Amino acid sequence: MIDPAYRKKMVVVEGSYAVAHSAKVCRPNVISAYPITPQTHIVEHLSQFMADGEIPNCEYVNVEAEFSAISALIGASAVGARTYSATTSQGLLLMHEALFNTSGMRLPVVMTVANRAVSAPINIWNDHQDAIAQRDTGWMQLYVEDVQEACDTLPQLYKIAEDNEIMVPGMVCMDGFILSHVYEPVVLLEQDLTDNFLPPFQPEDILDPEDPKTFGAFASPDTYEEFRYLHEQAMQKALPKIEATAKEFEEVYGRYHGGLIDGYMLDDAEIVVMAMGSILGTVKDVVDKYRAKGEKIGVLKVRSFRPFPKEQICKAVKNAHAVVVLDKNISIGTNEGALFTETKSCLYNSKVRVPVIGYTIGHGGRDIPVESIAKVIEETKKVAKSGITIESQFMDLKEELL
Amino acid sequence: MSKTAPKTYITSGHSGCAGCCDAFAAKFTLMGAGPNTIVINPTGCLEVMSTPFPYSSWQVPWIHSLFENAGAVASGVEAALKALGKKDDVKVVSIGGDGSTMDIGLGALSGAFERGHDFTYVCMDNEAYMNTGVQRSSGTPFDASTTTTPAGKVSFGNPRPKKNMPAIMAAHGSPYVATTSIGFPRDMIRKVKKATEIVGPTYIHAQAPCPTGWGFDTSKTLEIAKLAVETCLWPMYEMENGEITQVRKVKNPRPVEEYLRAQKRFKHLFTMEGGEEEIKKIQAIADWNIKHFELQ
């Protein structure tokens, strides 16, 4: 039951509008982006806000490509500006080299990724392959379940990224079209609450003629490794900060979407379904049906993919009889999705011994019906009994097309 | 200009080769731009030799991001200074080589100029990828031998003339484009100063001979640079809003042979059969410059 006072605050808007509004109230100083489907509406709305003079002390750089979008933000962030961009798919891939450079220079750029499949074949619909392909770039990656979370995670991520102990860039990964183009009820972030929650960006080191500093120097084998180590340490420091920031956000705004992970019917679950992003809504619906029949099925939402919450995941599944991981991506050559591989990896180094199976699903925007989720759960129940795990597989492959 | 040379803001002690052209170019650029400058440096010799962590030769704020994005990083620096209300006091200058400027970074640089960001881009053109071992760039002149366009039994070296970069930048509607040479420090300092004082995207194309890549004695860098101008292979001019407004005259042009003979990269033209014909073609380039830029 939604509190009527809260309901009054809700509006039905397009996901992209809500995200653009969120970016606006975070008070960015430089926005730089290149339009690409399905991110386009986010940058169009921001452009309109700029045209209407609604974002004070902000410059919008209409770049000629995504590579320059992220590069401009590297320069801007180094000067001490809070920076924002949004992209997807080929655009995110085009940024790849500069993503490493952003994080290596420890510039807390924040970006929304409207996740989309990658070419070839060209496909504009949703899966997570684009962001998963950037998993080693040293950026934080938070995957969101719905539009409200896509909005609410932006100020959280700025707060985490701009912490002087962390200084690591981050992306909010929201499912393209499914969330970017959906109209659903949300509470648009209030400016006063956001100002209260998110302090101005105050980096310790900036490009300033008053106190000249060198950014992006050349490091030899004598020093390079230590930069990598410190970067990893910063990511580890982000783990508790992500948890704490989600709770702080809840105190200010009254909403909580999980920290590193979140559970649904998880505490006593014998079968756990793990996933990231908007698919979790469908999974929860299916789980509700199982729970109505008295079956102990639960959901483990992974919100933070980078940093990867190894400890939290091990703890969350330790009493389960079997776990199934649904991945909207595949690491070609392993026959597995990335979340599946990493989940197994962290369990191996723990005392938790649970059979884990994986499905790679929903490629290029293919719909994932409740029947398929139910089928997966049935397979997982078999695994729980037999203890025999199976090779990861593609869900609902059309054999006739092969 | 006052008789006292302006102060520069790059220290000695860097790891550049003896006679390094980039060190001169960076020095003269900062002598023109002054201390209130943020420098953006794409990947290249200059970046590698001036910032071996934890040391830095830069006494102004300096950032290196990647090989191909200096134009975009400069755009972001300028936009951020504007947004934060600091632009009036601070100059934004990018210093890159011919590879990062004319080849891999051309897209980002073109974008920045088309958008009209207020910054100055200085290309130190040493006419090949010197940082990776003297490979051809689009700044490499006709018939120069590089490691990817070597002279051989059936080749006189690089088969194409230099890309006309100043014309490309002027075509973006830049208010100020100039060519200069590290062989003429006063000219370079004056032009950089002028460029950084003009609002909008301005471009300086500086000739920067590389002793290692070109094959001449390390004491001769500035001499070779002067020779390029005196043989009319490197015309020095200024363009304002697309029009040539000033040209450095060369009263008695010297034959290109003098310039070519002084460098190992053109050595094959003096030993191979048909080399004389090639030298004539290079003389024709100089003659065209004399006519086109009215150098005499």
From Swiss-Prot, chain A:
Alphabetical UniProt keywords: Oxidoreductase
Full protein name: Pyruvate synthase subunit PorA
Catalytic activity: 2 oxidized [2Fe-2S]-[ferredoxin] + pyruvate + CoA = 2 reduced [2Fe-2S]-[ferredoxin] + acetyl-CoA + CO2 + H(+)
Coiled-coil residues: none
Enzyme class label: oxidoreductase
InterPro entries assigned to the protein according to its UniProt record, in alphabetical order: PFOR_II, Pyruvate:ferred/Flavod_OxRd, Pyruvate_synthase_PorA, Pyrv_Fd/Flavodoxin_OxRdtase_N, THDP-binding, Transketo_C/PFOR_II
Organism: Methanosarcina barkeri (strain Fusaro / DSM 804)
Enzyme Commission designation: 1.2.7.1
Subunit composition and interactions: Heterotetramer of one alpha, one beta, one delta and one gamma chain.
Lineage: superkingdom: Archaea
GO biological process terms held by the UniProt record: response to oxidative stress
Keyword Transmembrane carried by entry: no
Pfam families hit by this protein: PFOR_II, POR_N
Note: It also catalyzes the oxidation of 2-oxobutyrate.
Keyword Oxidoreductase attached: yes
GO function term, MF aspect, one: pyruvate synthase activity
Curated annotation (Swiss-Prot), chain B:
Catalytic EC class: oxidoreductase
Region (Disordered): 140-159
EC number: 1.2.7.1
Residues annotated to bind [4Fe-4S] cluster: 17, 20, 45, 210
Co-factor: note: Binds 1 [4Fe-4S] cluster per subunit.
Recorded catalytic activity of this chain's protein: 2 oxidized [2Fe-2S]-[ferredoxin] + pyruvate + CoA = 2 reduced [2Fe-2S]-[ferredoxin] + acetyl-CoA + CO2 + H(+)
MF (Gene Ontology): 4 iron, 4 sulfur cluster binding; metal ion binding; pyruvate synthase activity; thiamine pyrophosphate binding
Required cofactor(s): [4Fe-4S] cluster
Keywords for this protein: 4Fe-4S, Iron, Iron-sulfur, Metal-binding, Oxidoreductase
Biased composition (Polar residues): 140-150
UniProt-listed NCBIfam families: PRK11865.1
Other comments on record: It also catalyzes the oxidation of 2-oxobutyrate.
Binding partners and assembly: Heterotetramer of one alpha, one beta, one delta and one gamma chain.
Protein name listed in UniProt: Pyruvate synthase subunit PorB
Organism: Methanosarcina barkeri (strain Fusaro / DSM 804)
Lineage: Archaea, Methanobacteriati, Methanobacteriota, Stenosarchaea group, Methanomicrobia
